[in-house]
């Protein structure tokens, strides 16, 4: 980016990771792949309103909104990636700028499938959508860009593993493909632990571990 963040510079981060590893401490990066926020451009998108308590229930016919779904990262000028995130990369949004309305909107002009992705649980009907621009993992270009990004991040930081955010909202099929790619490219023993927030439901956590073929551990949310 073009502006230093409050968390320090890139070089400070690289130095901190190296210092931790030299002290025998493994570094796991906190990876958020479920959603994106802060787009710089609006696009006209066909959507349907969604019942927030049952995400499989659509409460309107398709209609057009203006949504912040185009991420061009102008400050980077294509330095790290020339991939452009637009509405084809997302399955839903939560804000219609032209209406100044906050709600859950399912994107319907989507060549990769109607509605939401298949998950292992039926909480809220389908809990694929969490917030902001929900990433569309059925789009093969998105999956390839996230693999490229994971490899770039490793080449930059040389991390030891992942803490995967909000995995309950992401299809296990994606993580099977992505983690296999990361381990093939980086290290077969690359560690991964997922945050599947479902306190008191151990069988559901075990179901997700089974669906991902043991590729990741999960935090024991039941202890909370």
Residue ranges of predicted features:
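Extracellular structured ligand-interaction cores
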Residues: 24-28, 68, 80-86, 94, ...
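Active-site-proximal helices and loops of the catalytic beta/alpha 8
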Residues: 17, 21, 35, 48-50, ...
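The substrate-binding groove and active-site-proximal loops of carbohydrate-active enzymes
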Residues: 1-10, 93, 128-143, 160-169
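Core domains of carbohydrate- and sulfate-ester-processing enzymes
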Residues: 47-126
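Lipid deacylating catalytic domains
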Residues: 120-123, 131-132, 153
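Substrate-binding cleft of carbohydrate-active enzyme catalytic domains
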Residues: 5-39
